[in-house]
Swiss-Prot record:
Protein name: Arginine repressor
Lineage: Bacteria, Pseudomonadati, Acidobacteriota, Terriglobia, Bryobacterales
Subcellular localization(s) per the UniProt record: Cytoplasm
GO cellular component: cytoplasm
Similarity remark: Belongs to the ArgR family.
BP-aspect Gene Ontology terms: L-arginine biosynthetic process; protein complex oligomerization; regulation of arginine biosynthetic process
Function: Regulates arginine biosynthesis genes.
Gene3D superfamilies with a match to the protein in the record: 3.30.1360.40, Winged helix-like DNA-binding domain superfamily/Winged helix DNA-binding domain
Keyword Phosphoprotein listed: no
UniProt keyword terms in alphabetical order: Amino-acid biosynthesis, Arginine biosynthesis, Cytoplasm, DNA-binding, Repressor, Transcription, Transcription regulation
Primary site of residence: cytoplasm
Name of one Pfam family that matches: Arg_repressor_C
PANTHER family: ARGININE REPRESSOR (PTHR34471:SF1)
Pathway: Amino-acid biosynthesis; L-arginine biosynthesis [regulation]
Amino acid sequence: MTKSYRQGQILKLIRGKRIGTQDELAQELKSQGIAATQVTLSRDIRDLRLVKTREGYKEMAEEEQGPQFSLLAGEFLRDVLRAQNLVVLKTSPGHANSVAVALDNEEWPEVVGTIAGDDTILVIAPDTPTAEAVQEKLLGLLEHQ
């Protein structure tokens, strides 16, 4: 079974039914005889540019790819905190990964990288002043919700 076949099946699944978690996706694939680890599914979700919404995983339309971070942040971002050169984003449970991927896709030059958990994103800036600027930028998004 190839990567492209597995990813094609993932797209068919999310187009046909509500898939809300990676566990649900893994179970659906398993029922089709396709075994995939959580790491593999995370990569597939990133490669396919899927976003996790309240209605489950969805494909991101080409025209949505630019402003997607603003949209996701507006819907799921709850708090922005800073500790030296690190900015911590709190999101609704289960949405940190999709918000982090969208932020990564923005390619902000002041962001070195991100690490996401279930409801927390660690945004790494090169230094404290840059982290302060990132925090202000993100707080601006919170204020416009």
